[in-house]
Amino acid sequence: MNIKSILKLGVLGLYGAAIGAASLAVTLVVDVAPAAAHGERSQEPFLRMRSIQWYDLKWQPKVTKVNDIATMTGKFHLAEDWPRAVGKPERAFFNVGSPSPVFVRLSTTLNGEPTFISGPLVIGRDYEFEVKLKARIPGRHHMHAMVNVKDAGPIAGPAAWMNISGSWDDFTNPVTTLTGKTIDLETFNFSNGIFWHIVWLGLGCFWIGAFVARPMFLPRSRVLLAYGDELLLDPFDRKLGWAVAILTCALVWGGYRYTESVHPYTVPIQAGESKVEPMPIAPNPVAIKVTHANYDVPGRALRVTMEITNNGDSEVNIGEFTTAGVRFVNKLGQSHLDPDYPRELVATGLTVDGDKGIQPGETREVKMEAKDALWEVQRLMALLGDPESRFGGLLMTWDAQGNRYINSIAGAVIPVFTKL
């Protein structure tokens, strides 16, 4: 290596140090607030309203100590009016949305069956889930239930704030291996991971540095465009390429053999699919047909006209309309509302014309209004600009005995600027 190359490397090093120092100074001087929650609002309203419809969600307890167990439970319905622009849930995985691994997920069940790989879900049916979480990082965290659907991406459900107290240093995650040895997954092979990061980063830096120290990328590109690659076929390049290729293969093979000798019994990543039967269809005497819907833009209100038929033996009354995790309730719905459900997702602006119950055997046209600023806060009014301007949600009714009936409703929605 000649003096010119050494000087070039020195200048590049100074540039790198200057950029690093400037970046550090910016992070120390500029006050950047961390993003804490509500990324789900960036998802399209038609995806949140008409794909997976969540209900009966619970987050317990409100405060969990490090190493203690918390749970997320609830149910979800796969809407019959599944959007055409969204991939069907033929391959779906139940997940948890959180700001980094603040909890460790211990187990997930769908309809009581352990679920740790993806599988098909049935449109038009319901599933009940339970997730057990072990508290890891202290703080106040926004926790979502979530379903990842192939060709559709993550579909986030409503979220609640879960608090973790204690010290992160006290966290442990012990498991027993097939050989009977107990290890702590929080710290197991940490030094080994650091070692391999250094090895591969070092090899990559050496590979790039070998070409940076010689004629730079831009001159090589100009020569290639002007004269072809004959002038660039340097014997040193071939020797260097073969040396790095052999070294890479040796590292991969050696690392594999070492791992086999240290850990002879391993379980491969599972590539099958989990087939979970949906919940049985509960008897529902209420039939609903949406005939008209509009969204009052200045009034922030969704108005729906429906034909409701009561085929049961008892009077039924509308109490709740839930969509995209937002629950619009009236007095009846409030009486059945879980007091621990996030207050920021509850709106009391549900009204029904007449407030008269639907009698057994009666078919009646009902006009419902769900009005609240949450349409704007949750960015659901953007459905007017969606490729499918349709709404969707779950309408809940109760009979005199307190039995709840759930109907998934959907329909085209028209924007208006005056009450029609």
Provide a role label for each language-model segment.
Residues 152-162, 401-409:
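Beta-sandwich strand segments
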Residues 204-242:
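Juxtamembrane interface at the cytosolic side of transmembrane helices
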